[in-house]
């Protein structure tokens, strides 16, 4: 896999608000239409307690890292066939890297 750009927090925040916020939170352990993204780095797919995952997400068994998220965010339905996530993906590498940077920074903050 090619090197992942470092990403820009502010640009990632904008991508998150436009593309992710409707279904996901990053600043709490609550779930919405999608599972919380708080603590996603290092977590195994399909393991947020209380969230009703698809069988595909539960059985994928991927550990979310910068690399796996970068690949997943390109085309979620291709990466996990059968996922319930309706998001089509982010084709631009910089946008994916920016979003990952934003998630990393937000997840490093203690919960309120």
UniProtKB/Swiss-Prot annotation:
GO biological process, one term: electron transport chain
Protein origin, superkingdom: Eukaryota
GO CC annotations, alphabetized: mitochondrial intermembrane space
InterPro entries attached to this UniProt entry: Cyt_c-like_dom, Cyt_c-like_dom_sf, Cyt_c_1A/1B
Keyword Iron appears in the UniProt entry: yes
Protein family per UniProt: Belongs to the cytochrome c family.
Locations listed in the record: Mitochondrion intermembrane space
Signal sequence segment: none
GN (gene name): cyc-2.1
Keywords for this protein: Electron transport, Heme, Iron, Metal-binding, Mitochondrion, Respiratory chain, Transport
Keyword NAD: no
Organism: Caenorhabditis briggsae
Residues the entry annotates as binding heme c: 20, 23-24, 85
Taxonomic placement: Eukaryota, Metazoa, Ecdysozoa, Nematoda, Chromadorea
Protein name from the UniProt record: Cytochrome c 2.1
Post-translational modification: Binds 1 heme c group covalently per subunit.
An example Gene Ontology molecular-function term: heme binding
SUPFAM superfamilies named in the record: Cytochrome c
Primary location class: mitochondrion
Described function: Electron carrier protein. The oxidized form of the cytochrome c heme group can accept an electron from the heme group of the cytochrome c1 subunit of cytochrome reductase. Cytochrome c then transfers this electron to the cytochrome oxidase complex, the final protein carrier in the mitochondrial electron-transport chain.
